[in-house]
């Protein structure tokens, strides 16, 4: 066998593998169904704030993306040493984004106090902080619990 044929036999599989890798990277970038966010939670027994990276499904519209993020945030942290923002069973009833303001409605379970979650004022403050930090198009977050606007 000629020297050039041997080189081609070695080079051809490497070329095919390189093209396959490049194609898979492009397809992953285009079709990646997840968006990476950084969420902030308090720690049990301290005033420290820690971050947690979370993958949230990509949605078609900006408003739906904020809704998916908020739903995931309200579910609480994945790490047991971090405090959920609200009591167990709290859900997002609505999430509307208009003119740089997010209007977020939480179920009445957010009013329940538990040692297993942050206090209500801290939970609302952390909810606002998380949304504003992850979505640069949103400047203000107004929170409603059981359809009544609350400050935090």
Range-by-range predicted roles:
Residues 1-152:
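Bimodal "functional hotspot" detector
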């Amino acid at each position: 066998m000629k020297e050039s044929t041997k080189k081609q036999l070695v080079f051809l599989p490497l070329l095919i593998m390189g093209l396959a890798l490049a194609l898979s990277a492009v397809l992953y970038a285009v079709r990646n169904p997840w968006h990476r966010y950084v969420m902030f939670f308090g720690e049990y027994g301290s005033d420290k704030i820690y971050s947690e990276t979370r993958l949230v499904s990509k949605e078609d519209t900006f408003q739906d993306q904020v809704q998916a993020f908020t739903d995931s945030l309200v579910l609480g942290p994945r790490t047991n040493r971090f405090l959920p923002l609200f009591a167990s069973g709290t859900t997002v009833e609505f999430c509307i984004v208009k003119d740089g303001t997010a209007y977020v409605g939480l179920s009445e379970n957010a009013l329940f106090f538990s040692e297993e979650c942050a206090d209500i004022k801290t939970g609302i403050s952390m909810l606002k902080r998380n949304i504003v930090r992850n979505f640069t198009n949103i400047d203000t977050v107004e929170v409603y619990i059981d359809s009544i606007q609350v400050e935090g």
